[in-house]
Design a protein with these regions (language model features):
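Glycine-rich, N-terminal phosphate-binding loop of Rossmann-like dinucleotide-binding domains
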Residues: 25
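Hydrophobic beta-strand segment of the Class I
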Residues: 21
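SAM cofactor-binding core of SAM-dependent methyltransferases
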Residues: 1-4
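Class I S-adenosyl-L-methionine
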Residues: 10-18, 28-261
Length: 261
């Protein structure tokens, strides 16, 4: 059962008043990313929301939450969504502007802002997850030329199969980068490309896919973007608030009356 689907009202109906709730998000998962996918939204931080939901809906006399000290780190923040706006106002949760880097300046191009502000455009250019995962493994391995041949050999079958979907003669910046990346992969397997050139050949496509993935997350999670800045790459300026402040502001509010120590 997913924690998001638990109906705590049914638990209260079955067991009556709850004395204490014990739990907490997993400490080993507390990093801001699934770095394979370079995600913007930490699912482990999101588990904190679910734990607080459990407390509010079960209304226990007391609760024990593990790893609270880790939540005080600036690393653990929620991005403000449209759904959050009223909650932040009601509980006076402190927010600040946060810059989310979508694309480094050396990969920026004319028209990129129009793409990242259009969900249809994002979906149009975004690869199948399996395609990204395969090429991203190669990109990471390309930093070590001694290991790269083994990685390419291991993933050869999938890479050659996926290449069929990406090789094209388009002048579109993103599609052209896609094509160049997989053309280089095919050239390597045909002994027409030096392995040392692989990294540069696929970097652009990988960076565009990471940008698209992050911007899709912004749409999917209904995150409020204050503005986009282009002085140093492409950055989404969004508001965020500390996970710990969220926890403390809600649970210690007059409405709920808990004391966090």
């Amino acid at each position: 059962m997913q924690v998001y689907t638990i109906k705590y009202a049914l638990i209260k109906k079955k067991y009556g008043d709850i004395d204490i709730v014990i739990g907490g998000p997993p400490c080993q998962g507390f990093s801001n990313a699934n770095r394979q996918k370079n995600t913007a939204i930490s699912q482990n931080n999101m588990l904190v929301r679910q734990y607080i939901r459990a407390i509010l809906e079960l209304d226990p006399k007391a609760f024990v939450m593990e790893n609270v000290s880790m939540l005080k780190s600036e690393v653990h923040r929620f991005y403000l969504t449209r759904e959050d706006v009223q909650i932040v106002e009601d509980y006076n949760i402190p927010v600040k502007e946060t810059s989310l880097c979508l694309l480094e300046s050396n990969f920026a191009f004319d028209g990129v802002l129009n793409i990242i502000q259009s969900y249809d455009q994002i979906v149009k250019y975004l690869w199948d997850e399996k395609h990204y995962s395969e090429l991203n493994v190669v990109y990471k391995a390309s930093k070590n030329l001694q290991k790269l041949p083994d990685v390419l050999k291991k993933h050869k079958k999938n890479l050659l199969e996926f290449a069929k979907a990406h090789i094209n003669d388009s002048d579109d910046v993103i599609l052209k980068a896609d094509s160049e990346a997989f053309t280089a992969i095919m050239a390597y397997f045909s002994n027409e490309c030096n392995i040392a050139t692989i990294k540069d050949s696929i970097a652009e496509a990988i960076m565009y896919q990471r940008m698209l993935s992050k911007t899709k997350e912004i749409f999917d999670n209904d995150i409020v973007v204050e503005r986009y800045e282009t002085e140093s790459g492409i950055n989404a300026i969004i508001k965020s608030y500390a996970v710990y402040d969220y926890l403390k502001s809600i649970l210690e509010s007059e409405k709920h009356g808990y004391i966090i120590s």
